[in-house]
Design a protein with these regions (language model features):
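Flexible, solvent-exposed loop/hinge segments and secondary-structure transition points
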Residues: 2-260
Length: 260
């Protein structure tokens, strides 16, 4: 065949394109299991942060420290479980499907330290945003959070994931019981002090999107929270059951005074 002909050039180009496409397809198939494993590891790391659990080996730490991982419906009823030994967790695609699903199966991660972690997922300014919220035993008081995003503006909306002080602001805040369960807004626009945190200056849209996402997902879990949250009285009862008696409060004697 004449290597200078147009026919040769076309055939050569087609063969080259087919070879490159085959190599790319093979590489994608070969690398996908490793990519999926990395995504799962990152997801579990975020869950552990919300649960205030630390460990060098993320997967091993998760297996050791989690008590159980369940799925609940909108009524707060348990409808399934996640395999803890295999570190089975819901990824972002799984969470996205639950938003529009008529029969929801929402993940709940319950840890041995008493922290319960639930996820959230929604739309930010430039792409998806997500997060994990760790609750105290009352399932109202937030212990810790970890947020992530795909394309928010660096230095502005991206601060939901990058700014430690923003995450720290959630600690001690509670989920409300009214029409709005939680807000991320400027102080002047917030309805309550305890059921929300301040929005970032210059990142109003991302802040509002995160607030709406949290409010929506807390609504999904509202019945579960109401049915499973531990009250202060139940905490006292649990202490009595464990010790067999409630220790009396020891009176503190006043300090000696100096007589003139």
């Amino acid at each position: 065949m004449n290597t200078n002909s147009n026919t040769y050039t076309v055939i050569y180009s087609i063969i080259l394109v087919v070879i490159v496409a085959a190599v790319l397809a093979f590489s994608a198939m070969f690398l996908k299991p490793m990519q999926d494993a990395n995504v799962k590891k990152d997801t579990i790391g975020q869950i552990l942060t919300a649960a205030t659990v630390e460990g060098e080996d993320i997967l091993a730490t998760y297996q050791q420290e989690i008590e159980k991982a369940i799925l609940v419906n909108i009524k707060g009823e348990e409808v399934g479980t996640l395999n803890v030994e295999e570190c089975e967790v819901y990824g972002n695609s799984d969470l996205k499907r639950q938003i529009a699903a008529e029969e929801k199966a929402l993940p709940v991660y319950i840890f041995k330290n008493g922290i319960t972690v639930v996820p959230c997922y929604g739309a930010g300014l430039w792409g998806p945003i997500w997060g994990y919220v760790g609750f105290e035993g009352d399932l109202k008081t937030i212990k810790a959070v970890r947020f992530g995003h795909k394309g928010e503006t660096p230095g502005l909306g991206a601060k939901i994931a990058d700014e430690p002080s923003f995450a720290e602001a959630f600690t001690g805040k509670t989920v409300g019981e009214g029409e709005i369960l939680f807000e991320v807004a400027k102080p002047a626009n917030r309805q309550t002090e305890t059921n929300g945190v301040d929005a970032f200056s210059g990142a109003t849209i991302t802040s509002q999107a995160l607030g709406k996402t949290l409010d929506q997902w807390f609504g999904f879990y509202q019945n579960y929270f109401a049915k499973n949250g531990i009250t202060a009285e139940e905490v006292v009862d649990a202490v009595i059951d464990e010790t067999g008696e409630l220790e009396p409060v020891t009176e503190v004697e006043p300090a000696n005074t100096v007589e003139e």
